[in-house]
Regions:
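Extracellular glycoside hydrolase catalytic/binding regions
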Residues: 1-55
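A short beta-strand micro-motif common to beta-rich folds, especially ectodomain repeats
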Residues: 166-178, 264-272
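Aromatic-rich peripheral "rim/lid" segments of glycoside hydrolase catalytic domains that contact
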Residues: 37-130, 134
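Solvent-exposed, low-complexity, repeat-rich "mucin-like" stalks and linkers
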Residues: 95-137, 194-233
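Edge beta-strands of extracellular beta-sandwich domains
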Residues: 180-190, 276-287
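Extracellular/luminal ectodomains and secreted, surface-exposed scaffolds of diverse proteins
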Residues: 136-154, 234-249
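Low-complexity, Pro/Ser/Thr- and charge-rich linker/hinge segments at domain boundaries
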Residues: 186-207, 287-299
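Surface-exposed, short loops/turns at beta-strand junctions within beta-sandwich domains
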Residues: 157-168, 255-264
Length: 335
């Protein structure tokens, strides 16, 4: 809502000051923080809602938008969009509003009771006409029901599609009377596991079993003083893909982040889109970093064999038991 308010305020002012006085305005660049570094910096559903609204409202206020892309989203060699859902959302918003939802995922935890799940829709004047799981249309009032703007996915349907495989077990495609489709991933997961580690600033990372979850955010404070660490000490939250990022079986902390920390104990708190929050302590002594998990058995020696494990292919998506996905994410050392 804060972002929406900023867009309304800015575009209204531009229209009032310039457009209404017959002075043309072009928005020459727009986007999201870290959007040019990785497609996973901003969660997919939140990304789509931003671009749906800004495209719609720019048209309402007669403000042409210029898409400024470094090749992250538009493949300049093969001339196609890497994310078709993003492209369709933007293009369709030029003609009519697309429907969105408060979330584009439903997390089902291992061994937890599976109940009906409510998803709040933002219909934007449209109506829901169909929900598909693959080629099959879900049966209204049996698999799901709709009451106003509340979509309820029934527990029996969720039970029927959940397997013992961590990650995305199904993707529901919601179709509306106008605009782009909205996808909802059904994700089976367990609490992620962060483990102890010892290494230098250059080599340190946190051995992690994601167990189907997606990494959302990280806070960093000095344990004794409770002050925020750098960079950008005005907030305890650190920038995704600049300070930290997920990879195969690990969370990587940027060497530059570790180097600028003061010696002593630093408390990190990792948030996951499943709702889990896990604390992790690092102790810095010169160039040496020791990581202590709030979950780990500290009588065991740290397993530094992780240092020899290749990064592999990964993405901030819940597609593997421990691995966050399928697309390559470069290591900090190679950037």
């Amino acid at each position: 809502e804060d972002v929406k308010h900023d867009i309304l305020q800015t575009f209204d002012k531009l229209n009032e000051t310039f457009i209404s006085n017959e002075i043309p305005v072009i928005v020459g660049e727009f986007g999201l923080l870290g959007f040019d570094k990785s497609v996973d910096t901003i969660q997919q559903g939140e990304k789509l809602k931003f671009f749906e609204f800004i495209t719609y409202y720019a048209k309402e206020k007669q403000l042409p938008l210029m898409w400024w892309d470094n090749g992250q989203h538009f493949d300049r060699i093969n001339f196609n969009w890497r994310d078709e859902q993003l492209y369709k959302t933007i293009i369709m918003s030029l003609g009519s509003r697309s429907s969105t939802a408060k979330t584009d995922f439903i997390y089902i935890k291992k061994d937890a009771e599976i109940k009906d799940v409510d998803v709040e829709l933002n219909l934007n004047g449209n109506t829901l006409i169909d929900i598909k799981n693959g080629d099959r249309s879900l049966e209204k009032d049996k698999d799901y029901c709709i009451n106003g703007n509340i979509l309820t996915v029934k527990s029996d349907f969720l039970k029927s599609i959940i397997t013992n495989r961590f990650g995305v077990n199904a993707t529901l495609i919601c179709k509306f009377s106008a605009g782009a489709d909205w996808k909802i991933d059904i994700i089976y997961y367990d609490t992620p596991s962060l483990n102890d580690m010892e290494a230098t600033e250059e080599d340190f990372f946190i051995p992690t079993a994601f167990n189907g979850t997606q990494l959302k955010a990280m806070e960093s404070i000095y344990k004794k003083s409770k002050k925020n660490t750098g960079p950008n000490e005005w907030t305890s939250f650190k920038e995704y893909n600049l300070v930290f990022k997920p990879a195969n079986y690990k969370i990587i902390l940027a060497p530059d982040f570790l180097k600028q920390l003061e010696d002593g104990e630093i408390l990190l708190k990792f948030y996951f889109w499943s709702g889990e929050a896990i604390e992790y302590t690092i102790i810095k002594n010169g160039a040496q970093i020791k990581g202590i998990s709030s979950q780990a058995d500290h009588d065991k020696e740290p397993d530094n064999t992780y240092l020899d494990e290749p990064d592999g292919d990964n993405k901030n998506q819940a597609y593997g038991e421990n691995v966050q996905g399928e697309d390559n994410v470069e290591s900090y050392q190679s950037e």
